[in-house]
Amino acid sequence: VKKINNSYVSMIWQSLSEGPNMDSSLIGLNLSNEESLSLVLLELITPCYDSFPFFIKERCRNSLAYAINFYDEELLLRLYESAIPLFDPPNNLTMKKFYVTVWGSLFPEESFLINNPEEYVEIYFNELYKK
């Protein structure tokens, strides 16, 4: 069973919210620019994800894969915006393509395709941090 929740998807995006440790040179980057997007993936999203405990990483990965496979553009955008990011999403990519780009950066050798959706179980919010 793979535990998922939309909050895990939002956790990935929270690294793009304003924080005391954010490098000021990154603020205002345009994610439609490929170099800027790569920089944000490398400097913000990946280190933040890497800092999560293993079980949270696993759930973020599973939740992101589920979102890519089954959510529409509107819900993908809403999950991105729920983290109150400092960056507008790229205007030259669909939200799904943006999510796939982030997936490729975080999990370069893994496929996001889901063959057995019944393996994925949505857990309640109060269970997010329970192993």
Question: What do these predicted ranges mean?
Answer:
Residues 2-6, 31-35, 54, 58, ...:
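Alpha-solenoid helical-repeat scaffolds
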Residues 12, 16-17, 63, 79-80, ...:
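C-terminal catalytic/scaffold cores in eukaryotic proteins
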Residues 22-75:
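Amphipathic alpha-helical interaction modules
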Residues 1-45, 103, 125-128:
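Short terminal alpha-helical segments
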Residues 77-131:
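Amphipathic alpha-helical binding modules
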